[in-house]
């Protein structure tokens, strides 16, 4: 669980607790009130449906978590709106006159001996490396291997003398691995396939809610923005962990949802929006009868990774707020680290969040992000400050931070990861996401258990706009007159 958790927005919880022997009945129950769940709840409530949202955490938002920090807010989860056109998330902000700003950051490169790296060269090589992702090979292969081959050919043609500097090449490739992993949430860029259906939206890819916070999206979705009244037919119950979903074949029977606190609820249908990480852990016990084998296979073969953040607050900013700062190690400096310090080499750099003027975010991913969640707070703080001073402290005195936050997306039992990516099994299971999205039907062909969430979107998985699209998709499946 989060060691710091906040309620993202005020949600009216209507009705009195119901004894387990007398289940409450709704049109639709939504399990998980993240971006997909809140979008589905909003869509159905606007249509007059009686909806119950069950959320295991003590807040709505799911893998979006806006936290008050210092002189503003920071995002422990999703940071940006990725693209503008067409984006349900961006449109909602604009329609409600919420300021959304592009985060255009220049950068300065730092090496582990405190020297400055060649910014122009790194920009050229990084731009090329990220660009070849859009030019995949005919036969799919691990993304890291493909980028490495293409980059080496590029360097051989355009910067042949660099090939003599093995230390630079090795550490450049390790840095690019971290950059890809932070995009994908993977542990290694060789866990990612060159074959993907992911499609970027048009427009700026890093639009920030800045001081408004991503929490504003959920206030808009639930009609509580600017003290809105909410929806009269929507109930949201927090701290409600679902233990079992019993779905019938009989068209006249209800779906029954049981919670760990003994309460039970009934509905015509259920929309399940929990993360792939939760499905992986609980699919055997959560559904009765159990899921069909093809859906189980999709859950097993898809991958969810972890992106971790450590956010430091200082008395005042001592860095250029218009830049992010990549860290590239030198091999000799790495060799001097002890085995229990090696995890610090997994941070790709630091960047300033837009919702706060005195904070820096350090980014990690994969197994190291999982490890950082479990280490004592004082150890994390001490080691990341040693890292920051090693790279950025040459010729200056960097003060101690006055506060620290860190994410815990893997250790949180209600998320078990950050977001999904297309792994190297993707070519063998190209329809895994579509299969995961298929509803479970009763004997009449009516959908009884529906599935939403970023993992179920073929082209916009891993994003908030992808998650919201799936929530709208499944709500629309229950509203035949809706326009998809």
Q: Where in the sequence are the language-model features?
A:
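FAD-dinucleotide binding site
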Residues: 3-484
